[in-house]
Amino acid sequence: MTIRSFKTGVSREQPSFLPARVEDYVDANNLVRAIEVFVDKLDLEEFGFVVPAAAGGAGQPPYHPGDLLKLYIYGYLFRIRSSRALARELGRNLELIWLLRGLRPCFRTIATFRKDNWAALKAVNREFVLMMRELDLVGGEVVAVDGAFFHGDASRGSIKTQRRLAEELAKVDRDFEDYGAVLAKNDAAEATQDRAGEAGPNSGGEIEKKVAALMAKREALRADLARLEASGQTQLSQTDPDARLLSKNGRVVAGYNVQIAVDDKHKLIVASEVVNDGNDTGQLHAMAKAAKEELDVTALTVLADTGYYNGGELKACEDDGIVAYVPQAKRTARLEAQGRISHEAFVYDAEKDAYRCPADKLLTPSEGRKTNTGGRIEIRYTSRKADCDACVLRARCLSAKTPTRTVYRWEHEAVLERHRARMKTAAGRMRRRGAIVEHPFGTLKCRAGYRHFLLRGFDKVRGEWSLMALCYNFSRVLSIVGLDKLIAFFAKRAADLSLLGHRTALTAAIVSLVTLLAQLCDAAGSKSAATPLRWNLAG
C-alpha cells in the first residue's frame, strides 16, 4: 500500500477528563432539556403514579417517578425500550447521566415502573394532547382514523382456536388408537414367545409411558377447550391472555390492533386505543367520539378507509354530530359483470315509500319486518308478479323459479343515503386521508422500529402504547415549535396552573367563610327573631 497519512485517534493511555460539571454534558439546544422541563412541570401525584414504599420505613428511599418517566420518554424517543438496555445506557450515555443526575436504577426497578404505571402513562399522554390544543397545533375540524396490527409478546402457536384444539384432540385420539394396537400386538407376542432377551423399541413399558403422556396431553387439551367455551371467546391465548391471531391480506399476526385518530393540521395523534379485534368495522364511532371529546369540539369530520364501513357505526357518528366519510366496498361488481341487475339499481322513492326498478316499476313494502343476522331491522319491499312476468329485463333480474324481486331496506337507511350523497364529492378528502393517518404508523414502525409490544395484557400494552404515542407527538411538536418555545410554554403553563390553584384555594376559603357567617346569622336569628344580629365588619 502506498504510504500516506491517515487520521489517527487519541492514545488510550492519554489522560482525559469529562467536563467538570454534569450541566456541561449537554448543550443548551439538547432535547433532553425539553424532557426535563416537561416532566418537572407535571403534577405526577394527580396522574396516579405508583411509588413503592419501603417496609416499615427501612431500606433505601425509592426513585422519584419523575426520574423514571424521564428515562422512558428518552428511551422511546431514541428507540431504547428494553429495561436492561436502559439500565446499561445510564452508565455510559452522557445525556441520560445529565437527565437523571447520575442515578442508576436497576433494570427491575425500570421494568416495574412501566408495568405498574400503565394508567398514569395514559393520563400523561392525554395531558400532552391537551397541551397540543393549547399550543394551537390541532385544527379540531378533520381527523383521519386507521388501525394497524402490532405483534404482541406471544407466538402464533401459543394462541389456540376452537378448531385447532379440536384438531389436536382428534390427533391425540388417533395416536391412542395406534399405541393401543401396538400394545395389543405386544401382549399377543408375549403370550406365545419366550421373554428372554432385551426389550425392543416398541416394548410394552415404553409404549405405556407414551400412552401416559398422551393421556396427560388429552386432559390438558380438554381443559383448554372447556376454558375457551366458558369464556365465550373464539381464541385462547396461553401466553398473553389478551393477544389474538389477527389476519390481514394473508398475513397472520399474534398481537393487537392499534387504533388512532390523527388531526389533519400537523398529523398529531389526538386519540388512540388498543383492541384485539381482527377487523376495523366496529371501531369508527368509538375512535371518532374519543377524538371529538379530546378536541372538545361540537362537530367533527372523520375520514376512514373501506374497512370501517358499517351502517350502525355511521348512524352512531351522525347521532353524535360527527360527519363520516367512509368508502363502501363494491360488492356487486361480479354480479354486474355477468350482466345481472344488482340491488343498487333500485332507487328509493321517499314520497311513495317504494323502490323503483330499472324497468320503472314499483316495489312496495310488504307486511312485517325482518331482523337480519347482524341484528338490524329491515323492511321488505316486493315487486308485483304481473310486472315481473311481463318485464323484458326479467332474465337479468330473477332466476327462472323466482316469481318476484325483493329488496330489503334498513330502518335507518336514510343515514346511508346521506352518506352516499356525501361520498360522491369526497374524492379529494379520501386522498388526504392516507397522507394524514398513515404518517404516524409509518414513522413508528419504519423509523422507530416499533412493530411489537414488550408487555402482556390489555392494561400494560395500552400503557406501553401511550408511551409510543406520547413520544411520536413530542418529537413532532418539538420540530414544529422549536426547543426554546416549547420549554417556555411548559414553564408558563405550570406557573399559570399554580396561580390558578392558589386562586381556587382562596375562593374555596372565602366560600367556606361566607357559609359559616350565614350559619351564624341563622343561629342568632332563631334565638331572637325580634332583635336582628348586627355584624361590625369595619374593625
Regions found by a protein language model. Give the residues of each.
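Anion-binding and metal-coordination hotspots
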Residues: I3, T8-G9, P15, Y72, ...
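Hydrophobic alpha-helical membrane-insertion signals
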Residues: M1-I35
